[in-house]
């Protein structure tokens, strides 16, 4: 039996979900909630499940030598082409790639209908690059960040006012590599008490804060894909259309790829569609 919450407070001056879908529950085993800092017993069990997840090994790069492009100058992680680093086509010349490191926060909470939901943002329409696109809170690592979890939660606090003390960081997924060679670490965190989170979007970066059901990224509904080519290799880029209230959002590229993987790990099943064309060459390990 799941605990019932009050309706999620309106994401102040932003968009929040009102249409919730009944979803298949993740395959989790009931465990003690003593190690989880608040929330329902189901979220505590989910936290225990995700803490046991170990990402597969990925290619190793020397982080001391970094490649930077104009795309990463702003330090933000937004929707763009991206792959799990372990399947990116780098075997042709792996020594060439020295990516910068970044982290994004996949912040999960339990919706009013018991479904798992993830917090997303829409970038400000005033930004010069990728304006109006959907992204996960996140950005580049700073020298004082002790780990990827700190990077992700620090950026979330800066962008949407999410107090890090409300988030229980439970695991990190394997790195993703953006089109412009930014190594992105997805960090999964669980929002302990959604009623304590009152989003305060940074007006210089964020236009809206909203949430979506995590399971939608495993379904072949409101989704389309497009074949493209990168570095001589073909791949699929995914687009998810999502409507909440009177707002329509499109979640695509790197953000969609990360959420597909996060949903697969959380629900312990693959998506109901082909993720990408099986033509990638694996990097040397």
From Swiss-Prot:
Keyword annotations of the record: Acetylation, Hydrolase, Magnesium, Manganese, Metal-binding, Mitochondrion, Transit peptide
Ranges where the Nudix hydrolase domain occurs: 99-255
A Gene Ontology cellular-component term: mitochondrion
Annotated compartments: Mitochondrion
Any Pfam family: NUDIX
Region: Disordered, residue numbers: 51-72, 129-152
Transit peptide: 1-23
GO molecular function: coenzyme A diphosphatase activity; guanosine-3',5'-bis(diphosphate) 3'-diphosphatase activity; metal ion binding
Positions of Mg(2+) binding: 155, 159
Superkingdom of source: Eukaryota
Gene inactivation effect: No visible phenotype under normal growth conditions.
Main location: mitochondrion
Tissues and organs where the protein is expressed, per its UniProt entry: Expressed in roots, leaves, stems and inflorescences.
Keyword Transcription regulation: no
GO biological process: coenzyme A biosynthetic process; nucleoside phosphate metabolic process; succinyl-CoA metabolic process
Modified residues (N-acetylmethionine): 24
Nudix box, short sequence motif: residues: 140-161
SUPFAM superfamilies (alphabetical): Nudix
EC number: 3.6.1.-
Alphabetical list of InterPro entries matching this protein: CoAse, NUDIX_hydrolase-like_dom_sf, Nudix_hydrolase_AtNUDT22, NUDIX_hydrolase_dom
PANTHER family given in the database record: NUDIX HYDROLASE, NUDIX HYDROLASE 15, MITOCHONDRIAL
Function, in words: Coenzyme A diphosphatase which mediates the cleavage of oxidized CoA. Can use malonyl-CoA, hexanoyl-CoA, lauroyl-CoA, myristoyl-CoA and palmitoyl-CoA as substrates, but not isobutyryl-CoA or propionyl-CoA.
Family to which this protein belongs: Belongs to the Nudix hydrolase family.
Protein name as annotated: Nudix hydrolase 15, mitochondrial
């Amino acid at each position: 039996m799941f605990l019932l919450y009050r309706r999620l407070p309106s994401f102040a001056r932003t968009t929040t979900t009102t249409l919730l879908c009944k979803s298949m529950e993740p395959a989790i085993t009931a465990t003690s909630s003593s190690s989880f800092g608040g929330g329902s017993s189901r979220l505590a069990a989910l936290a225990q499940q995700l803490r046991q997840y170990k990402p597969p090994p990925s290619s190793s790069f020397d982080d001391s030598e970094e490649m930077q492009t104009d795309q990463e100058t702003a330090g933000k992680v937004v929707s763009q082409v991206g792959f799990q680093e372990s399947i990116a086509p780098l075997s042709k010349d792996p020594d060439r790639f020295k990516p910068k490191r970044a982290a994004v926060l996949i912040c999960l909470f339990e919706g009013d209908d018991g479904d798992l939901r993830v917090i997303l943002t829409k970038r400000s329409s005033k930004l010069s690059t990728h304006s109006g696109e959907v992204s996960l809170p996140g950005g580049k690592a700073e020298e004082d960040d002790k780990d990827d979890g700190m990077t992700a939660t620090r950026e979330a606090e800066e962008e949407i006012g999410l107090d890090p003390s409300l988030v229980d960081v439970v695991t990190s997924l394997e790195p993703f590599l953006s089109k412009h060679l930014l190594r992105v670490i997805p960090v999964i965190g669980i929002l302990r008490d959604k009623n304590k989170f009152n989003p305060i979007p940074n007006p210089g970066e964020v236009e809206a804060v909203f949430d979506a059901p995590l399971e939608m990224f495993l379904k072949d509904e409101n989704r389309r894909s497009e074949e493209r080519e990168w570095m001589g290799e073909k791949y699929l880029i995914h687009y998810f259309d999502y409507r909440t209230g009177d707002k329509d959002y499109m979640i695509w590229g790197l953000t969609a790829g990360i959420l597909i993987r996060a949903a697969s790990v959380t629900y312990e099943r693959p998506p109901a569609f082909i993720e990408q064309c099986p033509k990638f060459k694996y990097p040397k390990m």
